[in-house]
């Protein structure tokens, strides 16, 4: 592809020991001749002077030249590595611009060039930004896995399987004499079921990767005066919510964003759930349910002094029955300082149950470890791949088309409609890696990158 020659500072703005200027495009060699007086040997570090148009030395440092397509962007690339003073770097960029036909790079444009030149796919390009923005070791490991192609590999395997099945179905439709009763002999059904199972696994991994990157939304819910606001304060490490003995003190949604060992956690404190005629409180309860329905996890707060039950169905069946079927729930028996309960975690009917005292902090550290575990924190293991919300949406869309295709096969034996659903599934998956992606989406993704990346 033909691209502009672009330049940008690749290191962070400000004062530092080393500053790097990156140039990419067909005029990179012209810059080398103008600024260095010669073209460095490809892929070799060359210590030399960086000179102005009049021959004065601007700085001294190392020059690296990469001949396209054997470079990060796929274009000719020149890197000038000098001293990290911002004034010096600005002077050097100004000198590069004097060569002519060169412009300042837009945010993420070097990565965009690499994507357009097939040096990496879209998930790998996004992983560069995620690696830079990682807030914990787990996120960095996961981003690196994506950069190395782990996520792309999973998606490509799915695309290949869907494509092969689609071609088989279409061929059998076009040449019916070659395949008798091909829709009912079980071959297509078995292949389709395997793809659905594979996609389920990828979706689960992507959801975990998204939580590591974007954080987990945890909603604290329960009856009034169960200690929800006290737990919010204990997790946040500060007095974010007003705590009183008066039931219904919290009437609106309170939010805190914290990090557990660098992993982002979005905690939502909600109004106590109960039947009430108070209009303001009713609005707060409605907002509480809105937050619950969009949560990744619910901490069901129970006042341990009011019941000895641990099974949430026994504690409050109407509340549990109203929860989304796929929403994870952790039961928190609060006020252990008053009940004298042992601070231990138990499993009850598939629910994790923790005994704590939000007021004194007893058991809160164990609860934090539980939340870290839910977010995929692993202290000694390599991370899985990282994922973004758009990836989850594309996977969900692909899964929907597979389910529709399954219905066309099992209920209607409609080969043409099955093939169409497989085609739509293929398109949804290909959007993840950027094989079929709108220019608007590409612009949105790369514009969020750092300049110089």
UniProtKB/Swiss-Prot annotation:
K(+) binds at residues 225, 244, 246, 249. SUPFAM superfamilies: P-loop containing nucleoside triphosphate hydrolases, TrmE connector domain. Its main location: cytoplasm. One of its GO terms (biological process) is tRNA wobble uridine modification. InterPro entries: G_TrmE, GTP-bd, GTP-bd_TrmE_N, GTPase_MnmE, MnmE_dom2, MnmE_helical, P-loop_NTPase, Small_GTP-bd. Binds 1 potassium ion per subunit. Pfam families: MMR_HSR1 (PF01926), MnmE_helical (PF12631), TrmE_N (PF10396). GO terms for cellular component: cytosol. Residues 215-376 form the TrmE-type G domain. (6S)-5-formyl-5,6,7,8-tetrahydrofolate binds at residues 22, 79, 119, 453. It is found in: Cytoplasm. GTP binds at residues 225-230, 244-250, 269-272, 334-337. Mg(2+) binds at residues 229, 250. One of its GO terms (molecular function) is metal ion binding. Its EC number is 3.6.-.-. Keywords: Cytoplasm, GTP-binding, Hydrolase, Magnesium, Metal-binding, Nucleotide-binding, Potassium, tRNA processing. It comes from the Bacteria. Homodimer. Heterotetramer of two MnmE and two MnmG subunits. Belongs to the TRAFAC class TrmE-Era-EngA-EngB-Septin-like GTPase superfamily. TrmE GTPase family. HAMAP family: GTPase_MnmE. This is tRNA modification GTPase MnmE. It comes from Shewanella baltica (strain OS155 / ATCC BAA-1091).
